[in-house]
Structure formats: structure tokens, C-alpha cells
């Protein structure tokens, strides 16, 4: 089976960079897959697309060096199995509140006897290889999102779930339940302290810790803090910011001495 390079890298103690897809475009998926990210996540929760658009995005990612993973829309066993059959090599699952929900996530990603995943890998077999069944349970990576008060309360129970590879922090939803505003994960002390607590507990249980970051600069901060996977915003934000910067540069006075010379012909 094709190896899961981000899982191998995290097991070596190295931080991985993760891209994020929200626009529903296989072309943007292909571009992000060639941008240097260790993995790229197809966001089926808040992304502007459904499964029929997620499939060609996963196909596009499969032709790039990156590892294709997904954020499931919910902790729904059938949906998670479908996304794995489509070729996802990892699942980030939102709103995990307790151990039972974490066990449901893990069970959907593992074939018996470790779980309840139904056999029918389809694209997973094409992408992963003929020996997919033999290695899928050890290759697929699972992340439970910690972003609710109940999830915080039951954090240790969630982290103790057999087969769960790690937790993933959704900083905006986490900020909301802590009484803070979205986007304040680096400035509101309640968010700062809680993120540090979640990271420390993940390390205690020897689990991976991932987090969504608003930019590459924030990703660098999280990498130094010890996170194993840092998501460097999403392609919609990257496109918007680059477009705004290009317009601003075009309307700004050119630097002194950079005026184009007038051509006088051949």
C-alpha cells in the first residue's frame, strides 16, 4: 500500500504542513497539491461542495506529491466510509464530544476486528494499491476535533480512545465556546491557555496534535509550540489575499528608479 507520508513524518517527531480546500475545484486541488504541502485536506464540512465535487478533488490530489485527507461533514459512519473509499488517507472529524463519539470515528476508519468499516475501497484500492486491505488500518490517520465544552471536559477520555491517532483543534469554534471571538486564538488568554492545555494532554497520551492556522506565520508559531500538523489557512483565503495584494501593488506608486523604459523599436 502506498505509504501515508504524513503519518510516517509525525511518527518521526516532525511537524507536517497541511493545505485546505474550500472552493470545490479540482484545479485548485491540483495547484495546492503541487505547492509543497505534506498533506491537503478536502473540507467536506464548511467547503462549498458535496461528495460529487469532493471526488474529483481527491483524484486531482492523487496525482500530486501530497497526502489526500478529508474533514468529514459530521461523525457519520456512512459518510466517513464513503470518503475513505474515495481515496482519503486521513479523516479529521468535527465536534467530537466524548469517547463514544471518538470510538465511532475510529470504527468507521478500521476494518474488522479493529472497527466496522465495510469493505468496498473502490478508489482507495486504485490509489493505495492492491494490498490496501492488508495495511489500511495502520495507514489511515484519524483526528478528532476538540472544539466544544463537552469535548474539553472529556479530553482525556477522548485521547485514551484505542486507535485514535490524534486530536485537531478548531480554534474559532473553540474560541466561541470559551466566550471569545473567532480569530483571537493568539490574543485572548482563555484561548491561549486552553490550546496549550489541549496540546499538553495530547503529548501526555502520545497522540498527534493538529491545528488550523490563519496564515503561514501562525503556522510557524504552532510548529515551534510542538504541534504535529499545522494547517496554513485555506485556498480561498490565499487567493483573496493574493488578489488584494496584486490590486494594491498595481495602484501604488512604483518604486523610485523602476519606471519602465520607452521602447524605441528594434
Indicate where each model-derived feature is located.
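Expand to "…catalyze enediolate/carbanion chemistry for C-C bond making/breaking, isomerization
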Residues: 1-266
Amino acid at each position: 500500500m502506498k505509504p501515508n507520508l504524513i503519518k510516517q513524518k509525525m511518527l518521526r517527531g516532525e511537524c507536517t504542513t497541511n493545505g485546505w480546500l474550500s472552493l470545490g475545484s479540482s484545479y485548485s486541488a491540483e495547484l495546492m497539491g503541487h505547492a509543497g504541502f505534506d498533506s491537503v485536506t478536502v473540507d467536506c464540512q464548511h467547503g462549498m461542495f458535496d461528495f460529487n465535487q469532493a471526488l474529483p478533488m481527491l483524484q486531482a490530489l492523487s496525482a500530486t506529491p501530497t497526502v489526500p485527507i478529508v474533514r468529514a461533514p459530521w461523525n457519520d459512519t456512512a459518510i466517513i466510509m464513503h470518503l475513505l473509499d474515495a481515496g482519503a488517507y486521513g479523516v479529521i472529524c468535527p465536534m467530537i464530544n466524548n469517547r463514544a463519539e471518538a470510538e465511532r470515528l475510529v470504527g468507521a476508519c478500521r476494518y474488522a476486528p479493529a472497527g466496522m468499516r465495510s469493505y468496498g475501497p473502490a478508489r482507495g484500492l486504485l490509489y493505495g494499491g492492491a494490498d490496501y486491505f492488508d495495511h489500511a488500518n495502520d495507514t489511515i490517520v484519524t483526528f478528532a476535533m476538540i472544539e466544544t465544552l463537552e469535548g474539553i471536559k472529556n479530553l482525556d477520555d477522548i485521547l485514551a480512545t484505542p486507535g485514535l491517532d490524534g486530536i485537531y483543534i478548531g480554534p474559532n469554534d473553540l474560541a466561541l465556546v470559551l466566550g471569545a471571538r473567532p480569530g483571537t486564538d493568539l490574543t485572548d488568554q482563555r484561548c491561549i491557555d486552553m490550546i496549550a492545555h489541549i496540546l499538553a494532554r495530547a503529548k501526555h497520551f502520545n497522540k498527534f496534535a493538529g491545528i488550523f492556522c490563519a496564515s503561514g506565520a501562525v503556522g510557524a508559531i504552532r510548529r515551534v509550540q510542538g504541534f504535529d500538523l499545522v494547517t496554513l489557512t485555506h485556498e480561498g483565503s490565499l487567493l483573496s489575499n493574493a488578489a488584494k495584494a496584486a490590486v494594491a501593488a498595481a495602484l501604488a506608486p512604483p518604486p523610485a528608479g523602476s519606471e519602465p523604459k520607452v521602447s524605441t523599436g528594434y
